[in-house]
């Protein structure tokens, strides 16, 4: 089996693949203070809950945008499974071209999202990933990563609003039923979610206007909050919640791993 781990600023997502099939997955809080032993214990526990043993893991692959966590988690994977994980970054030999000015600065999650899109859809695609940041990443049908846009994520914006104002309450993010909020929590939901949806639509239209070949790219969404925003955004055509993990699986194959 393949153990695939994507370390993001807020959450770490772990997936277990049998062949090309994602058999199980789970989310952990990204905690830089965790020791390799603690990470190893956590991974072992989650594998057991999934009905799997660490001995069934034949290959492992890690992507990270949190350098302080990367080494410890890689050590944890090797301790738990005896398998040294491959690590994906801008130097990895993958079947896409990072056609940008600073390829080594492109986040691993952005690389994986566009790799998955290129391999799955074989068409020009914009991937909108709703994470700690909301990213818009552009990949052509022939696998050229063109760059993209990065804006504050939904929870990042919401948390900043709450922290920066004395009287606004913390509010659960739920779909707003109207734009004009009759209560403060309604007004916050409308501002954060409808504001994000309209920002997505506006930025996607701007990206389409700059697209090099004049074709209309496919627009897909991924990330933990994609299903919340997608119904509110006119430009999003489909949601693929496990796109980054799929990218890790594709990267593992491209790097010669077997499982």
Regions found by a protein language model. Name each.
Residues 2-6, 61, 125-129, 220:
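Short glycine-aspartate micro-motif
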Residues 2-48, 143-169, 174-178:
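Short glycine-rich, Thr/Ser-proximal phosphate-binding strand/loop in the N-terminal lobe
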Residues 2-4, 158-259:
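ATP-binding/phosphotransfer module of carbohydrate and carboxylate kinases, centering on a glycine-rich
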Residues 71-78, 137-146, 232:
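Short Gly/Thr/Asp-enriched flexible loops that form oxyanion-binding sites at enzyme active sites
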């Amino acid at each position: 089996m393949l153990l695939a781990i994507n370390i993001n600023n807020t959450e770490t997502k772990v997936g277990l693949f049998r062949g090309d099939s994602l058999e199980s997955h789970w989310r952990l809080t990204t905690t830089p203070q965790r020791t390799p032993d603690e990470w190893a214990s956590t991974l072992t526990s989650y594998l057991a809950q999934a009905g799997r043993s660490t001995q069934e893991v034949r290959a492992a692959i890690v992507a990270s945008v949190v350098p302080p966590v990367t080494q410890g988690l890689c050590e944890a994977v090797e301790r738990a499974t005896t398998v040294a994980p491959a690590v994906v970054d801008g130097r990895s030999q993958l079947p896409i071209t990072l056609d940008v000015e600073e390829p080594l600065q492109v986040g691993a999650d952005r690389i994986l999202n566009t790799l998955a899109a290129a391999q799955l859809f074989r068409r020009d695609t914009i991937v909108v990933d709703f994470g700690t940041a909301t990213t818009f990443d552009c990949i052509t049908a022939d696998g050229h990563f063109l760059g993209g846009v990065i804006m504050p994520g939904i929870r990042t914006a919401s948390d900043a609003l709450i922290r920066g104002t004395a009287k606004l309450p913390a509010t659960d993010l739920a779909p707003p039923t109207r734009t004009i909020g009759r209560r403060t929590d309604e007004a916050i939901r409308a501002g954060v979610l409808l504001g994000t949806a309209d920002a997505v639509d506006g930025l996607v239209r701007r990206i389409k206007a700059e697209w090099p070949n004049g074709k209309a790219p496919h627009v897909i969404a991924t990330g933990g909050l994609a299903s919340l925003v997608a119904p509110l955004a006119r430009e999003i055509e489909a949601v693929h919640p496990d796109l980054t993990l799929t990218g890790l699986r594709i990267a593992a194959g491209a790097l010669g791993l077997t499982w």
